[in-house]
């Protein structure tokens, strides 16, 4: 019996694939558990339209991410932090601080998408990676300055 998988199963395949399984396995386990659907003409057409919609949605998200990446690339962000005379910060500049400074500039980025190799603990200029989508990333230039 041909079924369409709704979830990834290591022994059968990935979600959305059409696989051939034994009738008993499909009728007694996969279909009642909601893991698979019978592969009829209607479900195959529905699957195809769903894939097209998903592809369109992903492309729209990719375009939006590229626009944000262009904005991020052009920014030279200033982050103010309390620091001692030696240039060492009292505390650290984290991805949350950077996300907040970005939102003040009008660019909304989730703090989890900002990748710091380690928290910033001294004054100076830094480059930080921002992964906005699967294959869209940008480099943000940050200058950490002392609060006056």
From Swiss-Prot:
Q: Which HAMAP family does the UniProt entry name for this protein?
A: Ribosomal_bL9 (MF_00503)
Q: Does the keyword Isomerase apply?
A: no
What is known about what this protein does?
Binds to the 23S rRNA.
InterPro entries documented for this protein: Ribosomal_bL9 (IPR000244), Ribosomal_bL9/RNase_H1_N (IPR009027), Ribosomal_bL9_bac/chp (IPR020594), Ribosomal_bL9_C (IPR020069), Ribosomal_bL9_C_sf (IPR036791), Ribosomal_bL9_N (IPR020070), Ribosomal_bL9_N_sf (IPR036935)
An example GO BP is: translation
Q: What is this protein called?
A: Large ribosomal subunit protein bL9
Per UniProt, the keywords (alphabetical) are: Ribonucleoprotein, Ribosomal protein, RNA-binding, rRNA-binding
Q: Name one GO molecular function term.
A: structural constituent of ribosome
Organism from which the protein derives: Chlorobium phaeobacteroides (strain BS1)
**Pfam (any one):** Ribosomal_L9_N
**Any one GO CC term of the record:** ribonucleoprotein complex
Per the record, the similarity remark reads: Belongs to the bacterial ribosomal protein bL9 family.
Does the record bear Coiled coil in its keywords?
A: no
Q: Which PANTHER family match?
A: 50S RIBOSOMAL PROTEIN L9
């Amino acid at each position: 019996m041909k079924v369409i998988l709704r979830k990834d199963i290591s022994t059968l395949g990935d979600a959305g694939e059409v696989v051939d399984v034994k009738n008993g396995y499909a009728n007694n386990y996969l279909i009642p558990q909601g893991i698979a659907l019978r592969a009829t003409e209607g479900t195959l057409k529905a699957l195809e339209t769903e894939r097209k919609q998903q592809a369109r949605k992903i492309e729209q998200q990719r375009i939006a991410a590229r626009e944000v990446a262009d904005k991020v690339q052009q920014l030279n962000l200033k982050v103010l932090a309390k620091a001692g005379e030696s240039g060492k910060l009292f505390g650290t500049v984290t991805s949350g601080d950077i996300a907040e400074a970005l939102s003040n500039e009008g660019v909304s980025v989730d703090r989890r998408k900002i990748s710091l190799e380690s928290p910033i603990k001294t004054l100076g200029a830094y480059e930080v990676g921002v992964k906005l989508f699967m294959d869209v990333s940008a480099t943000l230039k940050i200058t950490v300055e002392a609060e006056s």
